[in-house]
Amino acid sequence: MIYPQTMLTVADNTGAKKVMCIRVLGGNKKYAKIGDTIIAVVKEALPNMPVKRSDVVRAVVVRTKKSIRRQDGMYIRFDDNAAVIVNMDNNPRGTRVFGPVAREIRDKNYSKIVSLAPEVL
């Protein structure tokens, strides 16, 4: 569960390393789960990259420490909270995605993120 003020690692090569959630998009949601879109501010970034520190970006949550229950009764959780930075059309701004992503990302029609990911769990 990703609340406002939660720090997330960035799972792509846009140059941002850490972002902080400042808003969960989609109605009156209190927290974001895997596949939800958030507004975040970049807290750590690499120099000379497209995304700079203190930029406000949109991101899709791809991994959470909180376990989620699937339809078949299986639970899945990850070691970190991670997000992929996207543009207004929900396409990733980076050209690579690092680490595994959950299958729920495919169900939410983020097929470009799924195709860039090395592993889908």
From Swiss-Prot:
Predominant cellular place of this UniProt entry's protein: plastid
Database matches in InterPro entries: Ribosomal_uL14 (IPR000218), Ribosomal_uL14_bac-type (IPR005745), Ribosomal_uL14_CS (IPR019972), Ribosomal_uL14_sf (IPR036853)
Self-association state and partner proteins as the record states: Part of the 50S ribosomal subunit.
Organism: Phaeodactylum tricornutum (strain CCAP 1055/1)
Stated family: Belongs to the universal ribosomal protein uL14 family.
Coiled-coil segments: none
Described function: Binds to 23S rRNA.
Highest taxon listed in the record's lineage: Eukaryota
Gene Ontology terms for molecular function: large ribosomal subunit rRNA binding; structural constituent of ribosome
GO annotation, biological process: translation
Keywords, comma-separated and alphabetical: Chloroplast, Plastid, Ribonucleoprotein, Ribosomal protein, RNA-binding, rRNA-binding
Gene responsible for this protein: rpl14
Compartments in which it is found: Plastid, Chloroplast
This protein's name: Large ribosomal subunit protein uL14c
Pfam families: Ribosomal_L14 (PF00238)
GO CC annotation: chloroplast; mitochondrial large ribosomal subunit
